[in-house]
Amino acid sequence: MHPFFQELQQGSQKLGLSLSDEALTLLLKYQDALVLWNKAYNLTAIRDPKEMLVKHLLDSLSILKDLPAGRLLDVGTGGGMPGMIIALCQPERSCVLLDSNGKKIRFLKQFIADLKLKNVIAVQTRVENQDTIDELGQFDVITSRAFASLTDFVEAARPYLHEQSIIAAMKGLIPVEEMEELKQEFSCKVIELHVPRLDEQRHLLLLQRI
Protein backbone atom coordinates (compact mmCIF):
# COMPACT_ATOMS: atom_id res chain seq x y z
CA MET A 1 0.00 0.00 0.00
CA HIS A 2 1.19 3.52 -0.80
CA PRO A 3 2.47 5.33 2.33
CA PHE A 4 -0.02 8.17 1.78
CA PHE A 5 -3.03 5.97 0.90
CA GLN A 6 -4.75 6.18 4.28
CA GLU A 7 -4.02 9.88 4.63
CA LEU A 8 -5.55 10.60 1.22
CA GLN A 9 -8.51 8.32 1.92
CA GLN A 10 -9.24 9.99 5.26
CA GLY A 11 -8.78 13.47 3.79
CA SER A 12 -11.16 12.74 0.92
CA GLN A 13 -13.74 11.33 3.35
CA LYS A 14 -13.53 14.54 5.40
CA LEU A 15 -14.38 16.37 2.17
CA GLY A 16 -17.54 14.25 1.89
CA LEU A 17 -16.19 12.11 -0.96
CA SER A 18 -16.43 8.33 -1.33
CA LEU A 19 -13.57 7.65 -3.72
CA SER A 20 -12.84 4.08 -4.81
CA ASP A 21 -9.50 2.45 -4.00
CA GLU A 22 -8.79 2.62 -7.73
CA ALA A 23 -9.31 6.41 -7.82
CA LEU A 24 -7.15 6.91 -4.72
CA THR A 25 -4.39 4.77 -6.25
CA LEU A 26 -4.53 6.80 -9.49
CA LEU A 27 -4.27 10.05 -7.54
CA LEU A 28 -1.18 8.80 -5.72
CA LYS A 29 0.38 7.62 -9.00
CA TYR A 30 -0.18 11.14 -10.28
CA GLN A 31 1.46 12.65 -7.21
CA ASP A 32 4.42 10.25 -7.48
CA ALA A 33 4.89 11.24 -11.13
CA LEU A 34 4.65 14.92 -10.22
CA VAL A 35 7.30 14.51 -7.50
CA LEU A 36 9.61 12.67 -9.92
CA TRP A 37 9.26 15.11 -12.82
CA ASN A 38 9.45 18.08 -10.48
CA LYS A 39 13.07 17.24 -9.65
CA ALA A 40 14.10 17.96 -13.25
CA TYR A 41 11.42 20.28 -14.60
CA ASN A 42 10.30 22.48 -11.70
CA LEU A 43 6.58 21.90 -12.28
CA THR A 44 5.55 23.19 -8.85
CA ALA A 45 7.21 25.16 -6.06
CA ILE A 46 5.94 22.58 -3.56
CA ARG A 47 8.50 19.77 -3.31
CA ASP A 48 7.53 17.92 -0.14
CA PRO A 49 5.12 15.06 -1.01
CA LYS A 50 3.21 15.44 2.27
CA GLU A 51 2.63 19.14 1.56
CA MET A 52 1.73 18.29 -2.04
CA LEU A 53 -0.93 15.89 -0.79
CA VAL A 54 -2.67 18.73 1.06
CA LYS A 55 -2.03 21.75 -1.16
CA HIS A 56 -2.51 20.02 -4.52
CA LEU A 57 -4.53 16.82 -4.13
CA LEU A 58 -6.88 17.62 -1.24
CA ASP A 59 -7.23 21.26 -2.29
CA SER A 60 -8.30 20.18 -5.80
CA LEU A 61 -10.57 17.44 -4.43
CA SER A 62 -12.35 19.99 -2.23
CA ILE A 63 -14.33 21.31 -5.23
CA LEU A 64 -15.35 17.92 -6.62
CA LYS A 65 -18.81 17.54 -5.10
CA ASP A 66 -19.83 21.10 -6.03
CA LEU A 67 -18.84 20.89 -9.72
CA PRO A 68 -21.67 20.59 -12.25
CA ALA A 69 -21.53 17.67 -14.67
CA GLY A 70 -20.33 17.95 -18.25
CA ARG A 71 -17.32 18.57 -20.47
CA LEU A 72 -14.59 20.44 -18.56
CA LEU A 73 -11.80 22.85 -19.51
CA ASP A 74 -9.05 23.58 -16.95
CA VAL A 75 -7.34 26.86 -17.86
CA GLY A 76 -3.75 27.42 -16.71
CA THR A 77 -3.66 23.83 -15.47
CA GLY A 78 0.07 23.93 -14.67
CA GLY A 79 0.99 20.46 -13.45
CA GLY A 80 -2.69 19.42 -13.65
CA MET A 81 -4.48 21.12 -10.77
CA PRO A 82 -7.40 20.77 -10.48
CA GLY A 83 -8.09 19.33 -13.96
CA MET A 84 -6.12 16.07 -13.81
CA ILE A 85 -7.40 15.32 -10.32
CA ILE A 86 -10.99 15.80 -11.51
CA ALA A 87 -10.33 13.58 -14.55
CA LEU A 88 -8.87 10.77 -12.42
CA CYS A 89 -11.84 10.78 -10.03
CA GLN A 90 -14.53 11.16 -12.71
CA PRO A 91 -13.61 8.93 -15.68
CA GLU A 92 -17.04 9.57 -17.20
CA ARG A 93 -16.21 13.29 -17.59
CA SER A 94 -14.36 14.56 -20.67
CA CYS A 95 -11.57 16.97 -19.62
CA VAL A 96 -9.18 19.27 -21.50
CA LEU A 97 -6.15 20.62 -19.61
CA LEU A 98 -4.75 23.81 -21.12
CA ASP A 99 -1.47 25.59 -20.42
CA SER A 100 1.12 27.56 -22.40
CA ASN A 101 4.06 25.97 -20.54
CA GLY A 102 5.61 23.22 -22.66
CA LYS A 103 7.31 21.37 -19.78
CA LYS A 104 4.08 21.09 -17.82
CA ILE A 105 2.08 19.88 -20.82
CA ARG A 106 4.80 17.33 -21.69
CA PHE A 107 4.52 15.94 -18.17
CA LEU A 108 0.73 15.69 -18.43
CA LYS A 109 0.83 14.08 -21.89
CA GLN A 110 3.34 11.49 -20.68
CA PHE A 111 1.24 10.70 -17.61
CA ILE A 112 -1.91 10.38 -19.76
CA ALA A 113 -0.05 8.02 -22.13
CA ASP A 114 1.51 5.94 -19.33
CA LEU A 115 -1.86 5.37 -17.67
CA LYS A 116 -3.75 5.08 -20.98
CA LEU A 117 -6.31 7.63 -19.78
CA LYS A 118 -9.19 8.01 -22.24
CA ASN A 119 -11.14 10.95 -20.81
CA VAL A 120 -8.47 13.66 -20.66
CA ILE A 121 -6.15 15.48 -23.07
CA ALA A 122 -3.48 18.13 -22.44
CA VAL A 123 -3.02 21.02 -24.88
CA GLN A 124 -0.10 23.46 -25.02
CA THR A 125 -1.48 26.81 -26.13
CA ARG A 126 -2.53 30.23 -24.92
CA VAL A 127 -6.15 30.43 -23.83
CA GLU A 128 -6.84 33.40 -26.14
CA ASN A 129 -5.48 31.63 -29.26
CA GLN A 130 -8.23 31.77 -31.88
CA ASP A 131 -7.32 28.42 -33.47
CA THR A 132 -7.58 26.81 -30.03
CA ILE A 133 -10.97 28.43 -29.43
CA ASP A 134 -12.22 27.21 -32.82
CA GLU A 135 -10.83 23.70 -32.34
CA LEU A 136 -11.90 23.06 -28.74
CA GLY A 137 -15.33 24.70 -28.90
CA GLN A 138 -17.53 25.26 -25.87
CA PHE A 139 -17.49 23.63 -22.45
CA ASP A 140 -20.03 22.99 -19.69
CA VAL A 141 -17.57 23.76 -16.89
CA ILE A 142 -14.42 25.90 -16.94
CA THR A 143 -12.10 25.64 -13.95
CA SER A 144 -8.95 27.44 -12.85
CA ARG A 145 -6.73 27.69 -9.83
CA ALA A 146 -4.16 29.81 -11.67
CA PHE A 147 -5.67 33.25 -12.18
CA ALA A 148 -4.90 35.95 -9.61
CA SER A 149 -7.72 38.06 -11.06
CA LEU A 150 -11.30 36.78 -11.28
CA THR A 151 -12.15 39.27 -14.04
CA ASP A 152 -9.13 38.11 -16.07
CA PHE A 153 -10.28 34.50 -15.73
CA VAL A 154 -13.81 35.36 -16.82
CA GLU A 155 -12.47 37.19 -19.89
CA ALA A 156 -10.22 34.24 -20.75
CA ALA A 157 -13.11 31.79 -20.33
CA ARG A 158 -15.63 33.85 -22.31
CA PRO A 159 -14.98 32.37 -25.81
CA TYR A 160 -15.48 28.85 -24.43
CA LEU A 161 -18.88 29.53 -22.82
CA HIS A 162 -22.33 28.52 -23.98
CA GLU A 163 -25.47 29.91 -22.34
CA GLN A 164 -25.53 27.38 -19.50
CA SER A 165 -21.76 27.11 -18.87
CA ILE A 166 -20.43 27.41 -15.34
CA ILE A 167 -17.14 29.16 -14.54
CA ALA A 168 -15.61 27.54 -11.44
CA ALA A 169 -12.88 29.72 -9.93
CA MET A 170 -10.80 28.51 -6.99
CA LYS A 171 -9.81 31.42 -4.78
CA GLY A 172 -8.36 32.14 -1.37
CA LEU A 173 -10.07 35.28 -0.11
CA ILE A 174 -13.42 36.24 -1.65
CA PRO A 175 -12.73 38.86 -4.38
CA VAL A 176 -15.63 41.15 -3.44
CA GLU A 177 -14.70 44.08 -5.70
CA GLU A 178 -14.30 41.89 -8.78
CA MET A 179 -17.58 40.13 -8.09
CA GLU A 180 -19.19 43.56 -7.94
CA GLU A 181 -17.76 44.39 -11.39
CA LEU A 182 -19.21 41.19 -12.85
CA LYS A 183 -22.66 41.19 -11.19
CA GLN A 184 -24.48 42.82 -14.13
CA GLU A 185 -23.59 39.88 -16.35
CA PHE A 186 -22.94 36.89 -14.06
CA SER A 187 -24.63 35.37 -11.05
CA CYS A 188 -22.09 34.16 -8.50
CA LYS A 189 -22.45 31.46 -5.87
CA VAL A 190 -19.70 31.42 -3.22
CA ILE A 191 -18.88 28.12 -1.51
CA GLU A 192 -16.54 28.05 1.47
CA LEU A 193 -14.10 25.15 1.22
CA HIS A 194 -12.59 23.33 4.18
CA VAL A 195 -9.44 21.52 3.09
CA PRO A 196 -8.17 19.05 5.72
CA ARG A 197 -4.89 20.16 7.32
CA LEU A 198 -4.84 23.43 5.35
CA ASP A 199 -5.10 26.48 7.58
CA GLU A 200 -5.97 28.94 4.82
CA GLN A 201 -9.15 30.50 3.50
CA ARG A 202 -10.34 28.67 0.37
CA HIS A 203 -13.44 29.40 -1.70
CA LEU A 204 -15.05 28.11 -4.86
CA LEU A 205 -16.89 30.69 -6.97
CA LEU A 206 -19.47 29.38 -9.43
CA LEU A 207 -20.38 31.98 -12.05
CA GLN A 208 -23.07 31.74 -14.70
CA ARG A 209 -24.35 34.22 -17.25
CA ILE A 210 -27.59 35.87 -16.17
Curated annotation (Swiss-Prot):
Pfam families linked: GidB
Q: Where does this one sit in the cell?
A: Cytoplasm
Instruction: Write down the top EC class of this protein.
Output: transferase
KW DNA-binding (keyword) present: no
Q: Which domain of life is it from?
A: Bacteria
Summarize where S-adenosyl-L-methionine binds, as residue positions: G76, M81, V127, E128, R145
Catalytic activity from the UniProt record: guanosine(527) in 16S rRNA + S-adenosyl-L-methionine = N(7)-methylguanosine(527) in 16S rRNA + S-adenosyl-L-homocysteine
> Which coarse location class applies to the principal site listed for this UniProt protein?
cytoplasm
Main function: Specifically methylates the N7 position of guanine in position 527 of 16S rRNA.
Protein name, per record: Ribosomal RNA small subunit methyltransferase G
Record organism: Acinetobacter baumannii (strain ATCC 17978 / DSM 105126 / CIP 53.77 / LMG 1025 / NCDC KC755 / 5377)
